[in-house]
UniProtKB/Swiss-Prot annotation:
This is Small ribosomal subunit protein bS6. Belongs to the bacterial ribosomal protein bS6 family. Binds together with bS18 to 16S ribosomal RNA. Keywords: Ribonucleoprotein, Ribosomal protein, RNA-binding, rRNA-binding. The keyword RNA-binding applies. The lineage of its organism: Bacteria, Pseudomonadati, Pseudomonadota, Alphaproteobacteria, Rickettsiales. GO terms for cellular component: cytosolic small ribosomal subunit.
Length: 121
């Protein structure tokens, strides 16, 4: 198993309940294949650097996971097929910090409500 960090952007018109369903689907794939979710963060609705399709904003979600490369490929395949996800990136890392990400720290200092942060060690 290897550590990966995955960030995906969900269309701006998708509700928070639907975002939870998308993340739950990914969580199920990971857990069904003996993977572990170490960190899960919702970064909020953020303005995109450039317009993607009709989207000027997107819901950003971060997953820090311990999985095999086969699970990574399956997750990326599901992300590609999901029309609500407009962009995603998954990279292999040496370790996953138990600290909140810098983006989440900035949100906290700006008094923006944090909806979901989960850190499992």
């Amino acid at each position: 198993m290897s550590f990966y960090e995955s960030v995906f952007i969900i269309r701006q018109d998708v509700s928070l309940n639907d975002i939870d369903k998308i993340v739950d689907d990914f969580t199920k794939i990971i857990k069904d294949n003996d993977g572990t979710i170490i960190k899960k963060e919702y970064w909020g609705l953020r303005t995109l650097a450039y317009k993607i399709g009709n989207n000027k904003k997107g819901h950003y979600y971060f997953l820090g996971i311990d999985i095999t490369s086969n699970i990574k490929e399956e997750l990326e395949r599901k992300m590609k097929l999901n029309e609500s996800i407009i962009r995603f990136l998954t990279i292999k890392v040496d370790s996953i910090s138990s600290e909140p990400s810098p983006i989440l720290k900035n949100q906290s200092t700006e008094n923006t409500p944090v909806i979901d942060v989960t850190i499992n060690n």
